[in-house]
């Protein structure tokens, strides 16, 4: 497997104790230009020594340190001489391990709280106001600090909101410094990363590209790599990166299942094959997919048919190729975290190609598996990919098949394609395309009476869905300005045949999901 050699970068590792904010800690450190990874709390001191990090962060988590099944660590980690920052549960665990006292709080704190920094020499709060607002989320608290520590901040309901042992470079904050709700959270993490850990900001995307190109070449040699292109950001970035590294040794299969957005197949071919010279086998399978979907209206059945048929088409083409040794996928770090940590509550099914026959023995190449989504986009831009491809809206594996509610027909697909294009055009004109996390149109299968000109109509309703989210686990509907919504509505009704009504979905997730099916 060709993965990044990270030995040349300063690193700060985050140990996972189950907090919903774990990924944010890693992201914040990376935003400083320092490489960071989220690792299992079960990691040993010996394994950490091999990684040679500049610092360690203990994340928050839902446990009490006194729970029978609470997450623990190898106590030898405290003897490594590496700076440690404990956040929320991480601070309580450090206290518990080092001889302090943790108790249930008299008044639990969830949400905003004001803290007072009581030590004007506290390195974590250097040059920051003595009073600041933070984000608390805890039921236990530290009642007594371990030997060698001092209290450096307090709040009304938390007598020890932050503690420090400058000699050993061990620090704790009861609040979540990684979330934006904490007023000076970024500055606190910066002080830990640069002032305490003395890490260098030497993690850059240009260095990553050079490193990956070299490693891919060493791994692949003169052999061939197969990549399934979906037209999405991740697989497209992988394709351009691999092409830069190994050129025509890369073979791509792009299956057009007839469920893509308007002009999407042409855009992918023009950009990736035309501009970047990728070797792409395009399979036109629209008729094959639509015939399989004829008469099917149940959403899970549609998903299953689309998924199975895609795998079959991909397999049919892959079987024709000779001398393929590697399969490339656009796996991101979020996929690795969600499916590979001990504290993960759910297992995410990847949208990458799966279900390959057992007799197709490929080695796996996942060049993006250490990157977050925004870093993958940054990589695409650094590789010279066009903005409209790098910043393409997220798109589900089954495509428009789950944005047409009920039975899929070519006429219904055309309505969704045309209306979705208008939505994307107007959102971009309004300068909102980078502000709204995801937006699309959906055809609910509802028809209603309308009046157009002097005649009565009985046509379809188009739904608009636009949401903001950080990680996709929860989402809130986007507050698109009324004048922008009006332009979108007028254009769709006037330019898209068989549509006479537009509705805007103002439901959050939960209780709804982002997609309608």
UniProtKB/Swiss-Prot annotation:
Active site annotation, chain numbering: 88, 176, 178
InterPro entries the record matches: Class_I_gatase-like (IPR029062), GATASE (IPR017926), GMP_synth_C (IPR001674), GMP_synth_GATase (IPR004739), GMP_synthase (IPR022955), GMPS_ATP_PPase_dom (IPR025777), NAD/GMP_synthase (IPR022310), Rossmann-like_a/b/a_fold (IPR014729)
KW RNA-binding (keyword) present: no
Enzyme Commission no: 6.3.5.2
Alphabetical list of Pfam families matching this protein: GATase, GMP_synt_C, NAD_synthase
Known pathway: Purine metabolism; GMP biosynthesis; GMP from XMP (L-Gln route): step 1/1
Catalytic activity: XMP + L-glutamine + ATP + H2O = GMP + L-glutamate + AMP + diphosphate + 2 H(+)
Gene Ontology CC annotation, any one: cytosol
Residues annotated for ATP binding in this entry: 230-236
All residue ranges annotated as the Glutamine amidotransferase type-1 domain in the record: 11-202
Superkingdom of origin organism: Bacteria
CDD domains to which the protein is assigned, alphabetical: GATase1_GMP_Synthase, GMP_synthase_C
The entry's keywords: ATP-binding, Glutamine amidotransferase, GMP biosynthesis, Ligase, Nucleotide-binding, Purine biosynthesis
A GO MF term: GMP synthase activity
Residue span(s) of domain GMPS ATP-PPase: 203-392
Quaternary organization: Homodimer.
Record function comment: Catalyzes the synthesis of GMP from XMP.
HAMAP family: GMP_synthase
Protein's name according to its UniProt entry: GMP synthase [glutamine-hydrolyzing]
Species of provenance: Pediococcus pentosaceus (strain ATCC 25745 / CCUG 21536 / LMG 10740 / 183-1w)
Lineage: Bacteria, Bacillati, Bacillota, Bacilli, Lactobacillales
């Amino acid at each position: 497997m060709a993965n990044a050699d990270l030995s040349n970068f300063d690193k700060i590792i985050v140990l996972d104790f189950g907090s919903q904010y774990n990924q944010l800690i890693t992201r914040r450190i990376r935003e400083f230009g320092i490489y960071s990874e989220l690792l299992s709390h079960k990691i040993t001191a010996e394994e950490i020594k091999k990684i040679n990090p500049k610092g360690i962060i203990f994340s928050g988590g839902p446990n009490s340190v006194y729970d029978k099944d609470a997450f623990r660590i190898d106590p030898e980690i405290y003897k490594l001489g590496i700076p440690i920052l404990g956040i929320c549960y991480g601070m309580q665990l450090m206290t518990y391990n080092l001889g302090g006292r943790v108790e249930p709080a008299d008044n639990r704190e969830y949400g905003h709280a004001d803290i007072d920094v009581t030590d004007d020499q506290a390195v974590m709060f250097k040059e920051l106001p003595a009073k600041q607002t933070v984000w608390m989320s805890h039921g236990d608290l530290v009642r007594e600090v371990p030997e060698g520590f001092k209290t450096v901040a307090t709040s009304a309901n938390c007598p020890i909101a932050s503690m420090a042992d400058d000699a050993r470079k061990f620090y704790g904050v009861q609040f979540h410094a990684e979330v934006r709700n904490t007023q000076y959270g970024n500055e606190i993490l910066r002080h830990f990363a640069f002032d305490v850990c003395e890490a260098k900001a030497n993690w850059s995307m240009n260095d990553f590209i050079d490193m990956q190109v070299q490693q891919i070449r060493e791994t692949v040699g003169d052999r061939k790599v197969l990549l399934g292109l979906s037209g999405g950001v991740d697989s497209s970035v992988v394709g351009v990166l691999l092409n830069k590294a190994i050129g025509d040794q890369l073979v791509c299969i792009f299956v057009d299942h007839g469920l893509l957005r308007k002009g999407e197949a042409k855009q992918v071919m023009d950009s990736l094959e035309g501009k970047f010279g990728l070797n792409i086998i395009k399979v036109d399978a629209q008729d094959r997919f639509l015939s399989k979907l004829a008469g099917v209206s149940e959403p899970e059945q549609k998903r299953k048919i689309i998924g199975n048929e895609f795998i079959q088409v991909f397999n049919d083409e892959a079987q024709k190729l000779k001398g393929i040794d590697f399969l490339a996928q656009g796996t991101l770090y979020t996929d690795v975290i969600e499916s590979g940590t001990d504290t993960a509550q759910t297992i995410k099914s990847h949208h990458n190609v799966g279900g390959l026959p057992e007799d197709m023995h490929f080695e796996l190449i996942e060049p993006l598996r250490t990157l977050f989504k925004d870093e993958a986009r940054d990589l695409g831009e650094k590789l010279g990919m066009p903005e409209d491809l790098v910043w393409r809206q997220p798109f589900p594996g089954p495509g428009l098949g789950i944005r047409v509610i009920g039975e899929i027909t070519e006429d219904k697909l055309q309505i969704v394609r045309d209306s979705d294009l208008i939505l994307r055009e107007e959102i971009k004109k309004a300068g909102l395309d980078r502000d709204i996390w995801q937006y699309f149109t959906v055809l609910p299968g509802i028809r209603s009476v309308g009046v157009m000109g002097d005649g009565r109509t009985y046509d379809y309703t188009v739904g608009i869905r636009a949401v903001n989210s950080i990680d996709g686990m929860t989402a809130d509907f986007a507050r698109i300005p009324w004048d922008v919504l009006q332009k979108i509505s007028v254009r769709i009704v006037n330019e898209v045949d068989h549509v006479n009504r537009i509705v805007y979905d103002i439901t959050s997730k939960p209780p709804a999901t982002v997609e309608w099916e």
